Design a protein with these regions (language model features):
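Juxtamembrane or sensor-core-proximal signal-transducing alpha helices
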Residues: 2-24
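Histidine- and acidic-residue-rich, metal-dependent catalytic cores
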Residues: 28-182
Length: 182
């Protein structure tokens, strides 16, 4: 996994050092936010790193497919990988009593927990509003907001379905669920 990321980084570095530096800072900031959120949640140790690794694996596998090769540019892949750690950033607004609760959440607690997706979208918009990289900003927003949408339309926060859900949010959702059941 990491050699692939490293190779991708080297390619960007050779193409444009300024973009490589910006990508590095964006990646470090995303990882920092994610670590801050994860430190509040006793139940997710390593979740951020694992889901980022799963997203990386899926994107690299998809890039080998003829259909996705046309859709997945190197910049897009880099942006999705860098945005992946931010998918749960909205949990920073979730009370500790819910984040750290052992056992099953009540219906009311679950409703509060579900707000982390919409909260994450807002946090991304506010935090990165002045970032020149509009593509990263949009991808990060959509990954945070839509990673709990379901293909059948029964997800949250917006009840999007099928192709209404951005590809990167669907990829993040698969990584998130896979990590939860592993």
């Amino acid at each position: 996994i990491f050699p692939t990321i490293l190779l991708l980084g080297i390619y960007i570095d050779f193409e444009n050092p300024a973009i490589r530096k910006l990508t590095m800072y964006t990646d470090e900031m995303a990882d920092g936010f994610a670590t801050m959120v994860e430190s509040r949640d006793n139940n997710t140790g390593g979740h951020i790193k694992r889901t980022k690794a799963y997203v990386t694996l899926m994107l690299n596998k998809m890039r080998g497919d003829r259909y996705y090769r046309r859709v997945l540019s190197r910049d897009y892949i880099t942006n999705v990988i860098n945005a992946a750690p931010l998918h749960d950033v909205g949990k920073i607004a979730t009370p500790d009593s819910i984040l750290q609760k052992p056992g099953k959440l009540t219906d009311e607690e679950y409703a509060i927990m579900k707000r982390h997706a919409a909260d994450g979208g807002k946090i991304i918009q506010q935090t990165f509003r002045d970032l020149d990289d509009a593509d990263f900003r949009q991808i990060a927003y959509e990954v945070a907001r839509f990673h709990h949408e379901k293909y059948n339309g029964k997800g949250y926060p917006d009840g999007l379905k099928a192709e209404e859900i951005p590809l990167h949010a669907r990829i993040m959702a698969v990584a998130d669920v896979f990590d939860a059941v592993s």
